[in-house]
A protein has these predicted regions:
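ABC ATPase nucleotide-binding domains
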Residues: 1-60
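A composition-driven signal for long, intrinsically disordered, charge-rich low-complexity tracts
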Residues: 3, 8-11, 65-68, 180, ...
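A sequence-level detector of short, solvent-exposed, charge-rich linear segments
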Residues: 8, 15, 19, 23, ...
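Phenylalanine-focused residue identity feature
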Residues: 15-17, 57, 61, 67-68, ...
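ABC transporter nucleotide-binding domain
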Residues: 45-79, 113
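Non-catalytic connector elements of ABC transporters
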Residues: 65, 74-191
Length: 191
């Protein structure tokens, strides 16, 4: 894929590449059009589509995303505060969303943007607690589910395996705290 992209750039021609493989699309593209039922939902760069999708559909279509229902408490040009039942109050910076106080919204966080902590971090912004669910070791990373008290569906968390270990890192029902950066959150209107 990387060689094909280099060849395209050296020759300087335009490629139109149709694929269902998201990794291929993200690797080979300068711009991606996400379509649904024959209609273009969004056109943007791979980074823009992944990090700042413009709709819940695109956010869910490109990669994995955890969605939490919320309501806007405050909104300025530089920050948004959202109240959610599952996560509590969420602070968001670097948001492209133009939201109004009282508006229903989705708080969307990618699984790799949620960092697990296995000892109580104390009072910390953008932190919630839960219990470990099932996990899967995938070689370079592990996926696991966290059950939150105020949410029926578990939250998917992706953790990079930075150390060489084949031991199970996480035990079911173990307490865990999830933390995320304020600029790792995407806020989307909930219609």
């Amino acid at each position: 894929q990387i060689e094909l992209r280099q060849l395209q750039q050296q020759i300087g021609i335009t490629f139109l590449f149709v694929t269902h493989d998201q990794e291929e699309a993200l690797t080979l593209s300068d711009r991606i059009a996400v379509m649904s039922e024959g209609a273009v939902m969004e056109i943007a760069s791979p980074g823009q589509l992944y990090e700042s999708p413009g709709s819940p559909f695109v956010a869910d279509f490109i990669g994995s995303m955890n969605f939490f229902e919320g309501e806007i408490l405050s909104s300025t040009d530089s920050a948004i505060t959202v109240e959610t039942s599952a996560l509590g109050t969420v602070s968001v910076t670097n948001s492209d969303a133009k939201m109004t106080v009282g508006q229903k919204a989705w708080v969307a966080i990618r699984p790799e943007k949620m960092q697990p902590v296995f000892a109580d971090p104390g009072e910390h912004a953008n932190t919630t607690s839960g219990t470990m669910g099932p996990s899967a070791y995938l070689g370079d990373r592990s996926h696991f589910y966290v059950h939150l008290p105020q949410r029926e569906d578990p939250v998917l968390v992706a953790l990079q395996n930075l150390e060489r270990s084949i031991a199970q890192l996480h035990k079911p029902n173990q307490p865990v705290w999830l933390q995320w950066a304020s600029d790792a959150v995407v806020v989307l209107p909930r219609d």
